[in-house]
């Protein structure tokens, strides 16, 4: 941290266990786990360099008190990876959770679209449209990587809606006036070869620029085969 530019701070993300429908942690179905206490302790130890992001599964029996505790302890956001954690953002079970987030102003940073780096769980939970429930409760939502990989069912078209690109569903919500000031896109990982096709599209949307946030997607940026600079040249 000694080499950080003055005034720069990095958010340290916790990562909760996968939980079943009864809210029980399923450690055998979890790729990794980073406790809130660990992320918070580092942020408190080095407050000039770090802030912390909590990760609390909404099905947990202690989800609401844990959420209040995280807010009191200075968490700046909540991290979800729905498919890997077993979270359905469209579930009514999340409503009280959403109410608290909306009242506190704490945002959710949620993956959307296909997930490859952290495998397991239910990929359908990554459908960007499932996050409408949080947005409609007034929760600020940051969709990681602008949902730039994979395909999902267009639920706006009903139960038989067509399967379309996840990015197109994200873009639709970004263009809805009611989500102005609530929905944001994270542009980390857009330079990876499986997502690079969206980079130019996102940059061309100048009206989105104030709502695009820069994450690191660490540690994947250090895995060089994931990047193909020649694809940027081809896109012009």
State the predicted function of each range.
Residues 61-71, 89-97, 119-134, 152-176, ...:
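Distinct, well-ordered alpha-helical segments
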Residues 6-9, 14-124:
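Active-site gating/metal-coordination segments in enzymes
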Residues 13, 53-55, 79, 142-145, ...:
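Active-site neighborhood of phospho(di)ester-bond hydrolases with catalytic His/Asp-centered motifs
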Residues 16-25, 142-160:
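A short, flexible N-terminal coil/short beta segment enriched in small residues
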């Amino acid at each position: 941290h000694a080499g950080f530019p003055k005034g720069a701070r990095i958010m340290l993300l916790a990562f909760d266990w996968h939980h079943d429908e009864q809210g029980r942690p399923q450690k055998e179905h979890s790729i990794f786990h980073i406790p809130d206490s660990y992320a918070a302790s580092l942020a408190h130890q080095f407050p000039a360099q770090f802030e912390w992001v909590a990760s609390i599964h909404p099905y947990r029996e202690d989800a609401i008190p844990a959420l209040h505790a995280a807010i009191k302890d200075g968490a700046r956001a909540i991290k979800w990876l729905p498919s890997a954690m077993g979270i359905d953002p469209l579930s009514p079970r999340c409503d009280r959770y959403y109410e608290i987030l909306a009242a506190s102003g704490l945002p959710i940073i949620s993956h959307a679209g296909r997930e490859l780096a952290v495998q397991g769980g239910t990929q359908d939970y990554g459908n960007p449209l499932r996050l409408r429930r949080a947005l409609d409760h007034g929760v600020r939502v940051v969709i990681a990587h602008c949902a730039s990989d994979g395909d999902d069912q267009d639920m706006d078209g009903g139960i038989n809606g067509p399967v379309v690109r996840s990015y197109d569903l994200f873009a639709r919500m970004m263009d809805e006036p009611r989500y102005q000031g609530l929905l944001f896109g994270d542009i980390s990982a857009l330079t990876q070869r499986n997502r690079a096709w969206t980079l130019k599209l996102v940059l061309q949307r100048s009206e989105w620029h104030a709502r695009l946030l820069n994450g690191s997607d660490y540690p994947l940026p250090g895995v060089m085969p994931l990047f193909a600079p020649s694809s940027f040249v081809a896109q012009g």
